[in-house]
Structures are given as structure tokens and as C-alpha cells.
Amino acid sequence: MIEALPSGIVLGLIPITLAGLFVTAYSQYRRGDQLDI
């Protein structure tokens, strides 16, 4: 049970991290389009 908690935390953080990276990349992509215009 002791090892289940860290693994659960990691499994919970991975989607959040991927979502954060996607939002950051998307926002930078949108800024690039606005600057190009």
C-alpha cells in the first residue's frame, strides 16, 4: 500500500503535466500567428 500512493500521485500528475504543456504550446502558437499577422 505504501508504494501505491506515489504511483497514484505520478499517474495523476502525468495528465496534468501533459495538459499544461499542451496549453502552453498552444498559447505560444496562437501568439506566433498574431505576431506574423
From Swiss-Prot:
Keyword Transport: yes
Keywords noted in UniProt: Chloroplast, Electron transport, Membrane, Photosynthesis, Plastid, Thylakoid, Transmembrane, Transmembrane helix, Transport
A single BP term in Gene Ontology: cytochrome complex assembly
Membrane topology: Single-pass membrane protein
Subcellular location: Plastid, Chloroplast thylakoid membrane
GO cellular component terms, A-Z: chloroplast thylakoid membrane; cytochrome b6f complex
Transmembrane portions of the chain: 5-25
GO MF annotation: an example: electron transporter, transferring electrons within cytochrome b6/f complex of photosystem II activity
Record-stated family: Belongs to the PetG family.
Subunit organization: The 4 large subunits of the cytochrome b6-f complex are cytochrome b6, subunit IV (17 kDa polypeptide, PetD), cytochrome f and the Rieske protein, while the 4 small subunits are PetG, PetL, PetM and PetN. The complex functions as a dimer.
Job of this protein: Component of the cytochrome b6-f complex, which mediates electron transfer between photosystem II (PSII) and photosystem I (PSI), cyclic electron flow around PSI, and state transitions. PetG is required for either the stability or assembly of the cytochrome b6-f complex.
Protein name: Cytochrome b6-f complex subunit 5
